[in-house]
Amino acid sequence: MPELENPFQETLLSRHRAEPCTVVIFGATGDLTHRKLIPAIYNIAACGDLPPQFKVVGFARRDKTDEGFRTELEEGNRKNSRQGHNDELWGSFAQCIHYHRSEFEDLEGYKALGCLLDQFDVERGAPANRLFYLAAAPEAFKPILEMIRAAGLNKGVGDKWARVVCEKPFGKDLATARGLNAVVADTFAEKDTYRIDHYLGKETAQNIMVLRFANSIFEPNWNSRYIDHVQITCAENLGMEGGRGGYYDTAGALRDMVQNHLFQLLTLVAMEPPTDLSADSVRDEKVKVIRALRPLVGPEAVGKNVIRAQYTAGSVDGVSRVGYRQEDRVNPESKTEPFVALRLMIDTWRWQGVPFYIRVGKQLPKKATEISVHFKKPPQVPFATSTMLRNSENTLVIRIQPDEGIALRILCKQPGQAQNVQQVKMDFRYSSSFGKASPEAYERLLLDAMAGDATLFARRDEVENAWKFIDEIEHAWHKSDNPPTMHEYPAGSWGPKEADDLLRADGREWRLL
């Protein structure tokens, strides 16, 4: 009998080669362009993967020349390029960068942009694809999209495409997400809309599907029969640096991190195998996970399963930190949470009875994002001591950042006559196994958008179903007569005691990072 083909042997990491393209970045004078987007495009060029006859146009309100814009971007590239900065390569690369000044609401500015794009096509001798990247503030998305449509830039020239990439946050609740989706749908087809979440561009996040479905030692055990619980932690050791307090105080950890980044990781861990690796097949399974989340409705259910907290004054790495309400641009009476922990249940056959614990917070002891899958303990270990039995669970740890990799914790006998058993770690690290640093998330995602692969981008129904779940928690916090308590924790700790109690009530505890 012939061996069945494994569809995951051609993995999500397959390389793409895009056709000639112009990328237009709206909000090009902002931090994202300088720290992430231009260094990512430069790294793609350094690897030889940039499409031929490539162009970048920065679209923003400030007066700048092409040369002035290039000089500013060069400074950011020196600080942030994964490949390091090479003056000769930059000199060649910078010639593809141009600047276009316009207000976001000025139709004439978009018509002039269209003329510039047409001029590039004339210089190439043929039309090129066009990728519009919305890196501006969220409130600017609507006028930008409306002006793109009014200027006729949402249609490709000839047989070439026009696509849009939308940065997070994509709305601030279900109503605004639906409204924004409607505006996007009026301008671009869903197949040409790419809602970006940079966590999905990280190598280890992409590897979750391969780890699960291409390795027979894991998939048969990836269910409630063998898995006790799953933890997802995103810890940050910073607060509101860089003037983020103004934005963050209108969002909070639940909206800023859980609704997008951590739900994306959750769906990759919990999804069923897709029928193939097409974008919609993968995203169909991810949406099913979001829809299967057991709703948390009302203050009682939210209070029992969700812990929110603000940090008070403390120290991180020996540096004194002020409390959240004392941060610059934060309301002194703020009800916004920089820390949240959740206990979630997924009502599917595979995950019945398996809790998923999620926590994210600022001013914690270290910066780290990881997923830990905790397997059930064996029913009996004849040679085990009671102490060893308490620590006998096998754990699969997927490190998203830093030091991307995967570790499996197992039990082994210590050398010697006695039957002493100790937990040891089998560790895979990208840097040591492949001998080079992983590509930055934005490198992969930009190439995918240019190549037309939407697998690692959120679909409309995925975004809206995630907001539907989050809105119930926000409603219990801010619109109920008896809202759950806002707890506190000192900066430099691992969060409030109540977050520990959330697991202790189930006979579990957070994994030490």
Which role fits each region the language model picked out?
Residues 1-166, 170-513:
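Secretory/organelle targeting and membrane-embedding segments
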